[in-house]
Amino acid sequence: KTQAALLEAMEERQVTVAGEVRLFHLPFYVFATQNPIELEGTYPLPEAQLDRFMFNILIDYLSEEDELQVVNQTTTNTSIELKPVFTGDDMIQFARLVRYTPVAEPIARYAVRLVQASRPHQPEAFDFIRQWVSWGAGTRGSQNLILAAKARALLQGRFHVAL
């Protein structure tokens, strides 16, 4: 039921709880964590569902200083004042601007070829892909690669994607 609710939220921006549909307000993003050490006892997402996530970011353990800072900030009664750096409306406007950011055809073609090379049955796939990868990235991979490149360009102050 949890996975079904997660997928409903991701696809339809709503969840159904006890027969009642609850809509999410924009902006709406899903961030999920997966701890491989504790994976036993959970239900891993099938490849088709993993394909719906834009990024899979591997995060290593914190440095001693960073971990000490976390410990100090979370085990005392002092509060940290967080100051917003942007609003939900800012996020919505940025996401719209990403869609309007141009990408030259050779760059889009490069992104598609890169994603296609992740598929073991493709002639362009490297030997290690054929040996170790069961399924490569789907079309969403190409789409998300371009969207991420556009967002990165804007964050770097450029209004076009460059290599």
Could you tell me what each predicted segment is?
Residues 3-5, 10-101, 150-152:
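Canonical AAA+ ATPase core
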Residues 74-163:
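Basic, amphipathic alpha-helical bundle interface domains used for macromolecular binding and assembly
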